[in-house]
Structures are given as structure tokens and as C-alpha cells.
């Protein structure tokens, strides 16, 4: 399963502030760890397996490791004004147990991006739990980054979605606006996301009985119909407008 979000940092944000970005990410890590303890420990990615286990990202909850910060400062030395990416993985070699996070920032005029990929043991269940549990992960990403959208879908769904220039619905799509069943009657569930008691957005869910599968024609058809419905109402953003 792949989670993708795009967001913008404030214009006042300092470049090369690795500690801030890693601290900011922590609520997402904590939510993932609560779903699957194999998602509790993360390491900076390296050029080989041995190197990729050298640098834990965190020394303690919400505390980026001294080693990780030093590696990132050295990696991007002299590149303060250039875009940067922090790549990390959970140290698990087997695909079904593996996971990775990519966080892009200092991107200037274009959006920052967040990508989480979680390997699954099979196509009929999710390591993260049922749709409500997965929606909690999406909601945490939403409250952490205030993104323009979040998608949660199998990676291969990209070839099945209706529009190439807009996010797809897949299993779940978060949009930072109130969405009701009147907007998308095809949705199987709508989950409001709130911060400080105020709704900031909605998670649109296309399947609730089992995890979304691109091999299930009904799942793909429902997601596609939701995409068309959103575009008809000008509710689905174009990538170029984010």
C-alpha cells in the first residue's frame, strides 16, 4: 500500500532544518507503530544493507538521532537552497514486512511531498488493519502536514485511475474540505478529519469490507466513479494547481 501527499511549508521555514522535519514526522511514525510493531524502528537509507542499518532515525520518541542529523548535514553540505529528500526504511528485508518513507522538502516553488510505502502479506488483508485503522493513518498525515491531498492505494492503481493530471481515489483520498454523501454518493464511507475541534478535511473511502484491490473490478469501478464525480464538481485538484 502506498500513501502519497503533497503539501507546502510556510515561506518562513528555514532550509536544511532536518531536526524540525523529523520531529514533525514523529506522529505519523507513532501511529504506524501502534498498528504494526514492525513499523516502530526506522533507519536512514544507504547504498547497501549494511550501511542502511547504521543510522537509526530516532534515539527516542520524537527525538531525531544525532547520527541521522549529522549524516543529513553532510549529505547536503553546501546545498542549503536546493531541494532535499530524507529516505528511510524499517530495516526489514522481506517485501511483505518492509516499509519505506520518503520526505521531500526545501522545494521552493513546487510542493513538498510525503510518500509511505508499506509491503503487504497478501491482497486480502492489510498490516495496518481495517479501513477505519488505515483511515487513522491518513488522518494523522493530514493533521501533521495539512496537505492538498492524500492518496492511499496500491502502487499499481496509478494505471487504473481516470485522470493523469489529478490524484486518484484508490482505497482512500483525503481532501482538505468538507465532503458529504451529496457530493459523492458512490463513496462507501466518509471520515471527517478535525484539528482542535474544527473539521479540516474529509477522507473519501471506496471500499470498507476488504482492503482495496486493483484485481477487483468493483473496487476500481467505484474509485473511478468517485474521481469523475469529484471532477464534475471541481473538487479534485490538478497537480499543477497545488
Regions found by a protein language model. Give the residues of each.
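Internal, hydrophobic cores of structured domains that mediate oligomerization or house catalytic pockets
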Residues: 40-154
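C-terminal interaction module
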Residues: 1-47, 155-242
